[in-house]
Every structure is written in structure tokens, then in C-alpha cells.
Amino acid sequence: MYIPAIGLVAGFEHESCRLVDGLIDPATLNLACAYTAPDRPYRLPGSNADDIVVIAGHAGAGTAAVFDPMYNADADHHNVQVGDVMYIRTETSGDHWLKYTASDLHSPEKGSLSQDVSVWGEGATPGRLLTISCIQPSFAPSVRNAVVGWQFAGVAGPGAELPPPVLPQGM
């Protein structure tokens, strides 16, 4: 996963995001995870995902975490802006990248996130992807989430409709 505008580069856990007390809680600080569940319509990232894709990652306070670049808790604002792009490469996509464009930004209370129609939509939402993290203020508990809505924009890479991303060295 790569978001050029904020320099975020992330790998993924091999398993679906775990749940702790009914809330998504990635198993590690340094990897993102995709959330799927038999009782939810969530899908894995793909060019033909027929419903919403959910990717989660931790933000840290006093320790580094994978989604730290997504939100500035001290200034209380998203670092991703509407129109920024994100690239995801999956086992299925091979050398190709799935390209998404940021469409909406949210910072709901954790307790209301699961029912927030402005985040989840109503009915199936093909091509929609959410990145979800905690807003982790310094020396305070996390009570809100940083959520970015993304819309699938196409496939990038060799022989695809879009050019591949220019990756940072070492990726």
C-alpha cells in the first residue's frame, strides 16, 4: 500500500483484521490489515470488488505505527486530502496496482462509527474503500477514528490503463 502525498508505505498482515470487544484491532503496530467477516459485506481489495473494502491500521502515541502519517492528532486534521491517490498491490494483482482516489474524510467518535451512514453508505458500495485508524492524541485516550473514503480509479502498471506509481527507493 502506498499513498504518495503523505509518504505512507504499508505492508499487510496475512490474516483478516482481528476483532477485540467487537472493534477492529490490527494485531501489529507496523502492518495494515484488511477486514472481512462472514456476517458483513466487506470485500478484499480488487478491481471487481462488489462492495466496500475496509483496511485498518494503528496510529501510535509515543510509539511509531503504520497509519501515523494519515492524521495529525496534535493539529486535529487529516493529512490525506480529497483527490490524493492510494495504490494497493495484492497477491492477485501481481505487478499491477489498484489505484484509489480519496473522496471523503471523517473523524467520528468510536462509538458511532459503525452506524455512520456518511462513512459506510446505504446498500452496496462497489469500488469504495475505507482506511480506518484511531486518532491518538498525546497523553490522552483515543476516542475518535480517522476515516478516509476512497473510490476505485482503475488498474495501474505494465500494460494497464494507468501508469504505475513512482515508488520510493527500497519499496
Region locations from a protein language model:
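Solvent-exposed, non-transmembrane regions of membrane-associated and secreted proteins
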Residues: 1-171
